Each structure stands twice: as C-alpha cells, then as structure tokens.
C-alpha cells in the first residue's frame, strides 16, 4: 500500500482523499485489494466490462472482477471500471476507490488445487460508489492505473509483503 497506492493518491487524490486515506495507509488501518482483472479478459486490461453508470452523486457498478488477491481480508478496493464505450477502450476507464462492505458486493473464494484460498471473484450488483471515491478524472483511469503500475512493478519484491498490515496476520493464520 505504501509503495504503490500512497504515491498515486498523493498525485491524483483530492485534498479530502489525501487527508482521509494517507494516514490510514500509513497506520495499516486499511487493507486494500486490487480490482483489475475480469473474467474472459485475460491480460487485456483495457477490455474490462465492469460497468459504472453515473447516477447523481454516485456511480452504480454492475459486473465482476476475478483473481482478486486477499479481497476476503480487504476493507477497501482500488478498481478500474468502464464509464464509457466511446473511443479507444483505454479512454472509457475510470479509477475508483471503494469500501468492500458496500451493499451489493459479494466476495466468492477461488480455492487452489492445494485447497488454499488467496484469490477471489468479486461481484458487484447495483453497488453505489460516491463520485468522491473517484481518483483522477472520469474516463481517465487508464492514466491513473499506469501511474500506479510504475510503483507496483518497481523496487525490491520484499517490499510487497508490507502491503498486508500486521493486524491481518491473525486472520491469515
């Protein structure tokens, strides 16, 4: 979280998002999961279909994400959603930050052949996310995601273990 989400929130976040989310990331109070991959999309991230329709001060989400690591532990998700189908696929993507306890979100475990549970499919059924949860501009989430990936894919791999706060270790065991 500190390595990838914090820099992106610092760069694209509103003053309110920075004031609320950055201290929670630093303290480990929030556990984040990533809502990128979708069923049937393979490695083509821009082909995502999780639909987000603007309704007043909210986006209404319908669809699903898959291979979502630790969604069953997370209380927040950073998520790419489809807000427009016009133009190139990358131009109709919006980056949202959302609460995993929002009504309409269902986390379904994916068990490995060894019986382990690390991955999940996450379903969104009429999930309302406030517009204030948007990071960056509507339909410019591709830019935000690329920025995040520069941090996520850089640096020593051992730092990735810092993204799960110590408070979650009891739940894992």
Label every PLM stretch briefly.
Residues 3-19, 23-29, 69-76, 151:
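Internal helix-loop-helix
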Residues 62-108:
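A short core secondary-structure module
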Residues 1-4, 160-166:
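Conserved small/polar residues in nucleotide/adenosyl-binding loops
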Residues 28-36:
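A short, Trp-centered hydrophobic/proline-enriched beta-strand micro-motif
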């Amino acid at each position: 979280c500190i390595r990838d989400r914090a820099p992106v929130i610092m760069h694209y976040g509103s003053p309110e998002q920075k004031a609320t989310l950055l201290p929670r990331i630093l303290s480990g109070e929030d556990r984040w999961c990533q809502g990128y991959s979708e069923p049937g999309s393979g490695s083509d991230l821009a082909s995502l279909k999780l639909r987000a329709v603007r309704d007043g001060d909210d986006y209404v989400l319908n669809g699903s994400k898959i291979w979502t690591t630790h969604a069953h532990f997370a209380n927040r998700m950073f998520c790419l959603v489809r807000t427009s189908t016009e133009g190139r696929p990358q131009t109709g993507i919006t980056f949202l930050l959302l609460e995993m306890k929002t009504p309409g979100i269902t986390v379904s475990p994916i068990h490995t052949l060894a019986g382990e549970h690390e991955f999940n499919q996450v379903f969104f059924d009429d999930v309302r996310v406030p517009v204030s949860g948007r990071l960056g501009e509507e339909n410019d989430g591709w830019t935000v995601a690329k920025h995040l990936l520069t941090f996520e894919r850089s640096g020593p791999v051992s730092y990735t273990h810092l993204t799960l706060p110590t408070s979650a270790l009891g739940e894992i065991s």
